[in-house]
A protein has these predicted regions:
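Gram-negative outer-membrane beta-barrel transporters
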Residues: 745-747, 765-858
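Short, acidic Ser/Thr/Gly-rich low-complexity loop/linker segments typical of extracellular
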Residues: 57-68
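Short acidic/polar hinge/loop motifs at secondary-structure boundaries
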Residues: 72, 197-225
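Transmembrane beta-barrel wall of Gram-negative outer-membrane proteins
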Residues: 266-370, 395, 405-412, 419, ...
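Extracytoplasmic beta-strand/coil segments of soluble accessory domains associated
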Residues: 158-197
Length: 858
């Protein structure tokens, strides 16, 4: 905080210096005027990304995400101002700038542009907004508006993101959860709300679960693939910014309702949405409120396999699982926004959003273990085993595992105009949490089995041997099913963020060689805690209830499970029986291994930046910037030790507090060349970073001498740094549409992955397996992006209601300087989590409110 106050003092000193400069030219400055306003269409919908240009001064600005624009430092007089927007008729108007005052001038554009008898109507409004924002942006940005999102059956932000060029997603239960930008892992990109990074409720990563936020709760999704100096620098892949619904230009109201059906759960889904906005007190006060509710019962069929390399160097299957999931996800989201125009030069904004997701899950799993042990042991016994497991919870949680995730973000900001100087400030508080109360597992195990695996080398192998809880009793004690696990855990993860920032913008000169300077400072304080407490009641259950579970079975692995008929129904302990057990009356043993992942971390990041924008004639714009980010982190965790004795005695000891500090300097240089009004070329160089996971930094030592395994944290981890080059060309059609191509290169240094070593010696003890996160080396990432979007009205006017949208991204990665012990000379390694191909295609029909789309995502 002290560092932030010093930065603010420095910026105030710069302001006072600037003030002295103004004083020297006080006559001219006093007479300078300002234009401020908002761009809307005839239905009073805001138009972000509109171009506002004064030909006489060769000066232009672009409306922001809420449609506002500001022209400062204008000599009094009368000017012709031109406002243009793709798909709208341009407007030219005479404006007289008053001396020393601010003129408020809103502009209304007429919907529909007649071009060779092709009329672009309101059905394509969302495309126009997105295309205008991309067209007028200095960097490389992809934009999706709310009404575009609404035309696809996307329930959450993650599903909406997968349709953007260069983005692929990781799924959970059929829904997009984490987003990956330009072939980088989800850890290497950031997710922000209104420019502030979202806290994460994930325990092991900084990732944000995108399926937590309903798609209908945002106004715009911006994917900034080039990060400029006025943005947070921790975004190697890119920055995904979610712009929440802002106050309207006039009263508006909307309500939506929808449904669906899931064939696995055999239940209907429900989607509801409500939005209301208005302005009060002679339009000085604006308000927007929105509510979203979704209830989605679903399910999934899942088979998973684990492989290893044997002593002969052969890849062999060691484990196979078949899983049946039944999941219900209920999302509630509430947002509220106010803005107040104190006068034409000063505006305050208050925004808040709260998201809440209940995730009730039951899982029924069969595990076939030790599949690589195909022969008999020295005693003539088969060496494979099976486990049957039920995952659930208590009756108050529907006898299911409840994962309750919540996020909230509350921000207060101000925009002020002091003569030539613009001042924007903001303060925000955000919190994310995940609660898993009374999560229960009931697992049964049978040993001395032998399985037959079919198609072991293919993508979908399967076990033909029948596994049943009713088998094995005739084989005596050795063949019986035994209670392996009966556990209940309670977990809480929460992260709190507090941020303050102040930015200044000073226009220096106007004209074809006009320029401006931006500078500012930011302070972000983050705390994160993970607390898990787990007890095992298996021994007490066996002594008390013996085989009572056999009277409470349910048949799962449903009919129609996966393609084919090779998967047979299996009996499991029912979720109702598992939930009914009174574990509070049983004596349980704490599972210290689960608590060994607990930690506390506090991170403070102080940053400052400057950004210089320069026009190099009428067609070329340049932006040069530098950002400094100083990071200080303090953390502690736990060491877990399992003794190699008869009782396998466990201990848990605190690691103590550890600290780490570092400073990063992040330069950026961007160019944009307007070949003409429709063809735009962009080039940029930027430097970005990605900070290590909190859980990876904890200097814990977890020793399991029973299994002879060692897991360690690594407090010496350094941030991953990336040097980024981008080139792109975009052509924008007069009617709504574009064609674009781009190439990008990233030189990524010190990427982090887990190192796994066999037969590892630590403190004179040898361990079968050693795992530790490590800065593994460097990587080159090269990619190509292509996109095409257009309606078919250019072929024939009657086809204007039909269009096509398609994207394709290719990425290739190559690891260099790989420093894992014993693997230094390995070649042809790719960056973890990097897909080679991603693609989207959509053929659509839109006419008179009727919308049909056929979409494909790869």
């Amino acid at each position: 905080m002290k560092r932030f106050l010093r930065l603010v003092s420095l910026t105030l000193l710069i302001m006072s210096t600037s003030g002295n400069t103004f004083a020297e030219e006080k006559v001219n400055v006093a007479r300078q005027g300002t234009i401020r306003g908002r761009i809307v269409d005839t239905s009073k919908q805001i138009l972000p990304g509109a171009s506002i240009y004064i030909e006489k001064l060769h000066t232009g600005v672009t409306s922001d995400v809420n449609g506002y624009y500001t022209f400062a430092n204008l000599t009094p007089g009368t000017y012709t101002v031109k406002v243009s927007y793709v798909g709208y008729s341009p407007v030219e108007m005479k404006i007289t700038i008053p001396a020393g005052k601010t003129l408020e001038k809103d502009v209304v554009l007429n919907e529909g542009l007649e071009l060779q008898e092709v009329v672009v109507g309101g059905a394509f409004q969302g495309q126009r907004r997105a295309i205008n924002s991309q067209k007028n942006n200095l960097g490389i940005t992809n934009v999706v508006s709310a009404d575009q999102v609404g035309k696809f059956p996307d329930s959450n932000i993650g599903d909406a993101l997968k349709r953007i060029n260069g983005i692929n997603v990781q799924y959970d239960q059929g829904e997009a959860r984490f987003g990956q930008v330009r072939g980088t892992s989800a850890d290497l990109s950031s997710v922000t709300i209104n420019g502030n990074r979202l806290p994460s409720a994930e325990g092991d990563t900084r990732n944000v679960q995108l399926d937590l936020i309903p798609a209908d709760m945002v106004q715009t999704i911006e994917v900034n693939k080039v990060v400029t100096s006025d943005m947070d620098g921790d975004a190697i892949g890119g920055s995904i910014n979610l712009v929440t619904k802002s106050t309207p230009y006039k009263r508006m109201f909307s309500a939506t309702a929808g449904t669906g059906y899931n064939w696995i759960s055999q239940k209907a889904q429900l989607n509801l949405g409500f939005t209301y906005g208005d302005r009060f007190f002679n339009d000085k006060l604006g308000m927007m409120a929105a509510i979203s509710y979704q209830n989605a019962p679903s399910g999934s069929d899942d088979v998973e396999f684990e492989y290893d390399v044997n002593k002969k160097g052969e890849v062999v299957m060691v484990e196979a699982q078949k899983r049946q999931y039944y999941v219900t996800r209920e999302r509630q989201s509430y947002s509220l926004a106010f803005d107040y125009d104190i006068n034409p030069n000063h505006r305050l904004t208050l925004q808040g959003i709260y998201n809440r997701r209940h995730d009730w899950e039951n899982r029924y799993r069969v595990t076939y273990k030790d599949l690589d042990k195909t022969g008999l042991d020295d005693e003539g016994d088969m060496q494979q085993s099976a486990q049957i497991e039920t995952k659930g919870g208590t009756p108050d949680n529907r006898n299911a595992r409840l994962e309750l995730q919540q996020t909230m973000d509350l921000s207060l900001s101000g925009e002020h105009q002091f003569g030539k100087l613009s001042v924007n400030w903001g303060a925000s508080y955000a919190r994310a949490s995940e609660d898993r109360p009374n999560e229960r597992y009931f697992s049964l195990k049978q040993d001395f089995l032998g399985f037959t695996v079919v198609d072991a080398g293919d993508r979908f192998p399967y076990v033909t041997t029948d596994v049943s809880l009713h088998n094995g009793e005739a084989d005596g004690e050795r063949g019986k099913w035994k209670v392996k696990e009966l556990t209940e855990s309670n977990q809480e993860i929460y992260e709190k963020d507090l941020k303050f920032k102040v930015d200044f913008e000073l226009p220096l000169t106007n004209g074809i060689y006009g320029n401006s300077l931006r500078f500012g400072a930011k302070y972000a304080s983050k705390t994160k805690d993970r607390n898990t407490l787990c007890y095992d009641y298996a021994d007490t259950y066996k002594d008390t209830f013996d085989k009572d579970y056999m009277n409470n079975l349910t048949s799962q692995i449903r009919d129609g499970y996966m393609p084919g008929d090779q998967y047979k129904p299996t009996d499991f302990v029912s979720k109702e029986y598992l939930g009914s057990l009174d574990l509070s009356s049983m004596e349980g043993e704490q599972v210290l291994e689960e608590s060994s992942g607990n930690y506390h971390a506090r991170e403070n990041v102080t940053s400052a930046f400057f950004r210089f924008d320069q026009n190099l004639g009428k067609k070329i714009k340049m932006m040069a910037g530098l950002r400094m980010e100083a990071t200080h982190i303090k953390y502690n965790g736990w060491n877990w030790n399992v003794a190699d004795d008869k009782d396998e005695t466990e201990t848990l000891e605190p690691t103590g507090n550890h600290k780490n500090s570092y400073v990063n300097w992040l330069p950026s240089l961007l160019f944009k060349y307007d070949v003409n009004d429709d063809l735009k070329l962009r080039a940029s160089f930027t430097e970005t970073l990605s900070r290590p996971k909190y859980s990876a930094l904890i200097p814990c030592v977890n020793i399991n001498r029973s299994d002879n395994e060692l897991v360690m944290g690594n407090s010496d981890l350094t941030p991953t740094i990336s040097y980024n080059l981008d080139l792109s060309a975009d052509y924008y059609f007069k009617s709504v549409g574009l064609i674009s191509a781009g190439i990008f290169y990233k030189k990524i240094n010190d990427f982090i992955v887990d190192q796994v070593i066999g037969d590892y010696t630590y403190q004179n003890n040898e361990y079968k397996k050693f795992t530790q996160p490590k800065n593994a080396g460097d990587a080159d990432l090269l990619g190509v992006e292509l996109a095409y979007q257009r309606d078919f009205g250019f072929i024939a006017p009657a086809l204007k209601c039909i269009g096509f949208y398609g994207t394709y991204t290719y990425t290739h990665t190559q690891v260099n300087n790989f420093n894992f012990e014993g693997r230094e000379n390995e070649k042809d390694l790719s960056l973890p989590g990097s897909p080679e191909h991603t693609a989207n295609a959509s053929l659509y029909f839109e006419k008179k409110g009727f919308n049909v789309r056929f979409s494909y995502n790869y």
